[in-house]
Amino acid sequence: MKVLIKDNYDELSEVAALEILELIDKKPDCVLGLATGSTPVGTYQKLIEYYKKGKVDFSKVTSFNLDEYRGLNGEHPQSYKFFMNNTLFNHINIDKKNTFILDGLSNDIEKECIEYDKKIDNKGGIDLQILGIGGNGHIGFNEPSEELSISTHLTKLKTKTIKDNSRFFNSEEEVPTEAITMGIGSIMKARKIILLINGEVKAEIVKKLINGNVSTKVPASLLHLHPNCTVILDKEAAKFI
């Protein structure tokens, strides 16, 4: 695991965006794994800026999102489909037919999960996976547990995750209690992984991630086992390492 510490969030976002630009330049039809939440927003804003300057072409790019809340339709302002369209896809020339996001309203979740993993495999796998980390160490919605699911699956959200995500909703009670997420195995298949972490609020979990043991109790720690993973931190997130 390679660790980069940048001075601030803007620099962190710039480094991540340039990694994506370099990949698209080398492989215009690359497959990106994308994350939601507040951390990657700066990276997406940088990508939009580069697109508007004519420095990147997304027309052949395919993307797969990590997760989606169970029970929210794609028009709900807190669904991850809405987030991705509003934050990135509507502002670049990516073909929406090549943007894949799990269906939180699927009547057959097991089938939805199996088919999602098949779609990734049929596209040749993910070239670059962007990740954030939860305050309890989750990646995607792979929550701390005695054991972790390998493939895409339905999961119940931990109390801390619901509380952390309540800032995006009007109240904690509105936060869905379940989500569909790519599994640890699905994530680890990516040829390259970039984990973005910013802010003092993440400093404690960063200490566990970097200095602790590999454990399913800190799902992100399994990234130590990936052959090509880079963690990009700002100084606030890195204060305890």
UniProtKB/Swiss-Prot annotation:
Listed GO biological process terms: carbohydrate metabolic process; glucosamine catabolic process; N-acetylglucosamine catabolic process; N-acetylneuraminate catabolic process
Class of the enzyme per the UniProt entry, highest EC level: hydrolase
Keyword Hydrolase: yes
GO cellular component: cytoplasm
The keyword Oxidoreductase appears for this protein: no
Residues the record marks as active site: 67 (proton acceptor), 136 (for ring-opening step), 138 (proton acceptor), 143 (for ring-opening step)
A molecular function GO annotation: identical protein binding
EC number: 3.5.99.6
Protein's name in the database: Glucosamine-6-phosphate deaminase
Organism of derivation: Clostridium tetani (strain Massachusetts / E88)
Lineage of producing organism: Bacteria, Bacillati, Bacillota, Clostridia, Eubacteriales
Gene expressing this chain: nagB
